[in-house]
Amino acid sequence: MTRDGATARIGTADLHLHTLASDGTAGVVEILEHVEANTALDVVAITDHDRIDAAVAARAIARDRGLRAEVIVGEEVSTLGGHLLALFVEERIRPLRTLSATIAEVHDAGGIAIPAHPLVPYPLCAQGWVLRGLLDRSDERFHPDALETFNPTMLGRPWHTRVVRFADENGLAAVGNSDAHALGAIGAGWTEFPGRTAADLRAAIATRETIFRGSFHGTSGQVRTFGRQLAKYGRDAKAGAAGRIRRDGSGRDLGYPPEPAADLADEARP
């Protein structure tokens, strides 16, 4: 309840979406149109691997078109200690450094840091002993802001209960995300929070007022997505061999116009 007795509005967010810019299978405009037409999400974050250009474009397009869902610029950063969701960033966060240094850089850039699909015994995932070491440090610059406690993929499902318990025991906000690499997966995991804006979501993470929701994918759906990814990799390889994709990634069709809105900036380049 709010102070005047009214029922607080609960917003929904999916903070882990991939586009054609990394290993997703849908373009930016496709994703935005799908979110608008087929979900009730208030906030989404585009979090391609180690780049933010598509996320910056998505935010610009959403604002230009007046779409319902607010777009957060994010990045799934490849660190030496596992994948990390960097949200509310305006410049690319450098990959392939320690998890602690990456979290500190995200905070210094004004963002928040959330380990993706954590605790899974796999090199792409932050391990519990590493996270405890960070949380034990006196400098909060090295502390993660939340944990991705719900990830509906085969990577997240077996360890879900353990991650929820870890977040609770260590005083971390819990968020649910889809880790979507295909349109149909968007919203399979989500976060509920008081309010409806990205600012409301950020405040809720800071005060641990978030709740994760979602349903796990079946094996057949995961296999279909993997097949789409393989087809996408094949197209990229063919285009690269033909010289249409340069080393910086430019030339790849990311599913949005070259200049969708005025606030696309040079720093969004990978």
Q: Where in this protein do the model-derived segments appear?
A:
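Aromatic-lined carbohydrate-recognition surfaces of secreted/lumenal glycan-active proteins
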Residues: 114-124
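Charged catalytic cores and adjacent phosphate/nucleic-acid-binding surfaces used
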Residues: 1-15, 19-37, 41, 53-59, ...
